[in-house]
């Protein structure tokens, strides 16, 4: 399947100038989509994804829309590993009751609902946050599929070993929230981690050299509705980091894949 790289712009946070090879979708008219995803919004998002599937590099606005990653993985019809590089686990219980999809529970819903998921790899969260997943109830929920690589382990150089333990015959889908990065490299509307861009790119390089990659999505923009000075500063930082990630992935992702 041909790779199609897309921008899903809900908050008008992406520059209108076109980056080569990127298809821009104005999603500002999709109601019921911020933080929580209504059934109607989900169907409209699916309609944007369906023509070319999930293969490629996709920018999905702020972390308020990270649930799009769940919708993306619903299109995968083969065994796969989900790699989440994020400051948070996104494994909350539904706060509004029922089973409504949200930016805070989408990973949990992938675990519960996707029969093709083989492994879930959480990368970049603080150890104290991951420790909360170790209760008996959480262990039962994950059904032995969970692999955790804390930020502390990343700093100690242990990530490469853990990543290489994944089944090499199973392709991966990578989801990145830029809130995992230090504010030098990204400014988001969520609390952030301390990862450097160099560390993130090294993780991506390890994943792509070891495994076939189905697709990649990236969120972590800063909504324009916030204060103008802060927004303009965030815009400069985020555009720079998005451009760097896009060019890094364009240059390396499919190049490495073609040599396997």
List the model feature ranges, each with a label.
Residues 2-60, 64-82, 105, 115, ...:
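Catalytic cores of soluble, metal-dependent hydrolases
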Residues 55-59, 91-96:
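A short glycine/serine-rich beta->alpha loop
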Residues 82-94, 106:
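Long, hydrophobic, well-ordered secondary-structure blocks that form the structural core
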Residues 94-99, 187-189:
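Short, solvent-exposed loop/turn segments at secondary-structure boundaries
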